[in-house]
Amino acid sequence: MTSPKRPTIARIWRGRTTRERADEYEIYNYEVGIRPLLAIALGVQTFREDRADESEFMTISYWEDVAAMSRFTGSDPTRIHHLPRDPEFLIELPQAVQILRLLTSHGAMG
C-alpha cells in the first residue's frame, strides 16, 4: 500500500479587487480558477480580506514538489495563470506568485 502524497511546496497567489466587485469576483474566481485547480493540486485554500476600498484575495495551493507544480504552470513554476476576466475585476494584474517550502503542518485543515 502506498502512502498518500504529502505537500512540500505552497504556491501563493494574491489579487485585489474593488469592494463593489468582490462578491462577484469571489464566485467567478472559484468557478473558473479554483475548481480546475482542485483536480490537480494536493490541496487548495482561499482567503479574502475586506478593507475600506478594496478586497484582497489569496489562494494557497499545495504541491508534492516543484516538478508537480511545473506540470500545472509549464516550465516556469512562478508563471501566473490569469483568468480571462481578471483584467476586468482586478485592480492590477499580479506579476508574481510566492513559492514556499512547507516544513511542517499541524492540526486539522480542510
Model-derived features with residue positions:
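Glycine-rich beta-strand-turn "strand-cap" elements at beta-sheet edges
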Residues: 1-7, 42-58, 81-110
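Short amphipathic alpha-helical segments
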Residues: 17-43, 77-85
